[in-house]
Each structure stands twice: as C-alpha cells, then as structure tokens.
C-alpha cells in the first residue's frame, strides 16, 4: 500500500486510476440520463484542469532544470536517482524533472477544477449556472497568471531575495555554492507559481460568481 501511495513508479498508475474512475462515473451518468446528463461535463472539466496543470508542471520544470540542475539534483534530492556525475546527464535530468513537475501539479489542477465547479454551484441567491464551456475558458487564464507570477518570483529569486529570510540561501551566496543566483531563481519560480496559482484560482472563482450574477440581471 505504501508503494501505491508514495512511490514515483506508481504515480502514473494513480493518475490512470483516477482518470478511469471519472470516466466510468461520466459514462454511468450519461447512460442514466442521456441528453439530460450533466455530471460528465463536470468530470471532463476536472480532467482538463488536471491535464493542463500537468502540462504546465512538466514544461515549467524542463525550463527550470535547464536554469539550475543543482536545484533538482540537490534541492529535490535527485542525486541518488541521477548518480554521482555532476552535472548530471541531460536526458535523465529532464525526465526526472518532468516527474517532479507531474507530482507537484496534478493535485493542484484537481483543486483548480473543484474550485471552479463549487463557484458555479446554484444557490438560492444565484440560482443560475454558467455553462461548463464558460468555465473552461478560465483555466488557461489561471495558468497564464501562474506563469507571470512565477516569472516575477524567478526574477526576485535571482536577485537573492530568498537569502534575506533563509540561512541556507544566505550561506550559498556567501560561499558561492551551487550557482546560488540560478538556484534561487528556480526556487522563486516554483514559489511564485504556487502563489500565482492560488491568486489566479481566487480570481477565477470571483469572475465565475460575477458572471453568474450578471445572468440574473439579464
């Protein structure tokens, strides 16, 4: 059970099982309700949000592993997986970084999708809902805002801002270890990405509710 829940090799299996569960629920909903089925559209939105997050995570970590292999090798503990050679071979590094990206983002994508669906739930005050296709248009904007905030975080990291509150980064700068400015730039990209995703999801939820209120006035 521990292998299934925590190992890297079972990650694809866990994601596949999740997709199959949602696909099965969607098929059951469609079989029962046919043209009146709605759940399958919601499950599709969740799957697309997860897929978008995975793509973002993989691309993000392909770029950042090029900027600082040290961040992944030392910071993410990949030295055992990649071997003693430094810098590590390019292809194994990028494959390992891709896996790190998938692990870090698939659950975030699920949370984004759930947040949008909850924001679109009918209530007594706002009974009308947006179409799921309208919600889908917000997902690319979420990742765009995430990328922009991540880029800002990367710039601030390159300037050495994290060293002001983290002694490890301060020591890296003092001893010029692991190309510290690049290391902190990647740290800033990742931290900024998490903050950006939270901000963007909040904005998307507010936008969803705003659009729903506009439906009432129309």
What are these regions (language model features)?
Residues 11-16, 87-110, 176-200:
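Hydrophobic alpha-helical transmembrane segments
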Residues 27-45, 63-75:
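Membrane-interface helix-loop junction between the first two transmembrane segments
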Residues 30-42, 113-140, 206-218:
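Cytoplasmic juxtamembrane regions at transmembrane-helix boundaries
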Residues 48-62, 136-160:
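Hydrophobic alpha-helical membrane-insertion segments
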Residues 71-75, 150-173:
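Juxtamembrane non-transmembrane "cap" segments at the membrane-aqueous interface
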Residues 71-93:
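Perimembrane loop-to-helix junctions flanking transmembrane segments
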């Amino acid at each position: 059970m521990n292998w299934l829940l925590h190992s890297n090799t079972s990650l694809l299996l866990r994601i596949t099982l999740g997709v199959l569960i949602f696909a099965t629920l969607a098929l059951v909903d469609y079989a029962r309700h046919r043209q009146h089925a709605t759940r399958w559209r919601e499950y599709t939105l969740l799957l697309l949000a997860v897929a978008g997050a995975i793509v973002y995570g993989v691309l993000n970590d392909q770029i950042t592993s090029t900027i600082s292999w040290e961040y992944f090798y030392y910071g993410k503990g990949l030295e055992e997986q990649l071997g003693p050679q430094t810098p590590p071979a390019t292809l194994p590094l990028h494959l390992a970084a891709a896996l790190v990206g998938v692990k870090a983002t698939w659950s975030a994508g699920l949370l984004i999708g759930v947040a949008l669906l909850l924001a679109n739930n009918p209530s007594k005050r706002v009974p009308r809902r947006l179409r799921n296709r309208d919600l889908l248009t917000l997902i690319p904007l979420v990742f765009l805002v995430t990328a922009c905030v991540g880029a800002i975080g990367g710039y601030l990291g390159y300037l050495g801002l994290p060293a002001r509150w983290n002694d490890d980064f301060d020591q890296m700068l003092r001893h010029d270890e692991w190309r510290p400015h690049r290391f902190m730039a990647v740290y800033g990209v990742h931290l900024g990405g998490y903050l950006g995703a939270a901000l963007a999801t909040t904005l998307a939820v507010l936008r969803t509710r705003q659009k729903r209120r506009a439906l009432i006035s129309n």
